[in-house]
Amino acid sequence: IPATIPATIPATIPSPYIDLSDAYSPRLRDLARRMEGGVSAEGVYAGFAGPQFETPAEVEMARRLGADLVGMSLVWETIAARHLGAEVLAISLVTNRAAGTAPGRIDPAEVSRAGNEAAGRLADLLQRLLDQV
């Protein structure tokens, strides 16, 4: 996957018609749910191109369409991986409230800090998942 991923399917994927009916593996999702300290919730992820945070209007649009979470990654990588036939599990680490859902501005330093604080727990979970696969 290129370093910059556009909001459309990259032209390097031979077919734009990739079946995403089961984008995320039911088997791996079940495994992640059963792990101690694992996945605490499942939901609908809305992917935006980034690299900027979403606007309050984009967050509200995604909410109205049924999204529980918004972010700048995951979707494009999933499409590419499914195109290659990979079994995919997605785990999102929520590091901030979406724009417009809490007072104040999103602080990129705080987002990085929250990610760094959770890195060890996330690495442990991923290692335990990989040990089970």
Task: Give the label of every model feature segment.
Residues 1-95, 102, 108-133:
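Glycine-rich phosphate- or other oxyanion-binding loops that anchor nucleotides, phosphorylated ligands
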